[in-house]
Design a protein with these regions (language model features):
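C-terminal ends and interior cores of transmembrane alpha-helices
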Residues: 116-140
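Loop-to-transmembrane helix entry
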Residues: 46-49, 66-90, 111, 145-146, ...
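Pair of pore-lining "gating" transmembrane helices in MFS-fold secondary transporters
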Residues: 40-65, 152, 156
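Juxtamembrane intracellular "pre-TM" segments in multi-pass secondary transporters
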Residues: 17-47, 298-308
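Helix-to-loop junctions at the C-terminal end of transmembrane segments
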Residues: 91-113, 204
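A membrane-interface helix-boundary motif in multi-pass transporters
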Residues: 1, 109, 202-275
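C-terminal membrane-cytosol helix-exit motif in multi-pass small-molecule transporters
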Residues: 3-20, 277-284
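Loop-to-transmembrane helix entry/capping segments in MFS-fold secondary transporters
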Residues: 77-78, 144-145, 175-186
Length: 308
């Protein structure tokens, strides 16, 4: 601690910062965002933003729902936490490698390769969820290792994509406003992974078919009160929505899933992801890699404050 305090004090009083360029020192907040607005009008920047907005649709169901389905099928939350713990050192190692791979003429290649891997892993995740042992069977060691391996590989591909695209942002960002430039692109990238999630969750509910089954000996009056009829042999309504689950729980019933919308939704997402990759994202990325770094910037002329 003493050495840290000494070093910090030395930096505070004796270290001098490198002189700023006149363009950086004279640009205020208004000027920076004025430049950013002009940058957003560049055709290749608009294409990059468009790619960010659609790129994560393909594996959105896998990211948002697979973990929930594994827990729903009997995997303990502590087991998922173990997967995260195992995954952490791999993220550090492969994140560094991804940054190394993202240099040169084909800076987006690691991002594209990881894109394909995530689509494949989304299909693998569906197979893992489908093959989960049904209660009262327990999850065996081999199957548990398979789940952990799939989780680590998914996280690895996600890390490669994140680091790869961040490295590309670093290459194209204007050094004068690099922080603002990269914040804008990273915000758009995060938004691309956020906006589809609502629709994915709604699709899972929409495609799911389930019914409530009354327990043996349930009171006729209770059925009449909750469901409007007293015949326990008839379907007691859907059991997918929160309201349906609540009605079923009021009589002590059980929800039976006839068709899980997770598989339909994830399949639709993978098909959309593969189609957009082949016909939209890949051609755009190839063209963006050919854009020279100066073309991602705009002239600072006109943003300097007037001097008297």
């Amino acid at each position: 601690i003493r050495d840290s305090l000494f070093f910090t004090t030395w930096l505070l009083f004796f270290k001098r910062e490198d002189p700023e360029t006149h363009a950086t020192s004279e640009m205020g907040i208004r000027e920076v965002y004025s430049v950013m607005a002009r940058i957003c009008k560049l055709r290749h920047v608009q294409l990059l933003i468009f790619v960010h907005m659609i790129a994560k649709i393909g594996f959105q169901a896998n990211e948002a729902v697979t973990g929930l389905k594994l827990v729903e099928h009997g995997l303990g939350k502590e087991d998922l936490a173990l997967a995260v713990l195992i995954d952490f050192p791999f993220q550090l190692i492969f994140g560094y490698l991804a940054a190394m791979w993202s240099r040169g003429r084909h800076a987006l290649r690691p991002w594209l390769i990881a894109f394909v891997c995530r689509l494949v892993l989304a299909v693998v995740s569906m197979a893992i969820v489908e093959g989960m042992p049904k209660p009262p069977q327990k999850i065996g060691t081999t199957y548990f290792v398979t789940i952990i391996t799939s989780t680590v590989l998914n996280s690895f591909a996600s890390t490669v994509q994140f680091v790869g695209i961040s490295a590309f942002h670093t290459q194209i960002a204007d050094p004068l406003i690099g922080g603002t430039y990269m914040t804008l692109l990273n915000t758009v990238s995060n938004l691309g992974g956020t906006w589809p999630r609502y629709f994915v969750l709604k699709m899972v509910d929409f495609f799911t078919e389930s019914q409530c089954h009354a327990p043996a000996g349930v009171a006729v009056e209770k059925l009449q009160e909750v469901f409007g009829h007293a015949n326990a042999s008839l379907p007691l309504g859907e059991c997918t929505s929160d309201a349906g689950k609540h009605r079923c729980s009021m009589i002590g019933g059980q929800c039976e899933v006839l068709k899980d919308g997770y598989y339909t939704t994830s399949t639709i997402c993978v098909v959309i992801g593969a189609a957009t990759l082949a016909f939209v994202i890949l051609p755009i990325c190839r063209s963006l890699e050919k854009v020279p770094p100066p073309a991602w910037r705009v002239s600072m002329q006109g943003n300097k404050p007037a001097t008297h």
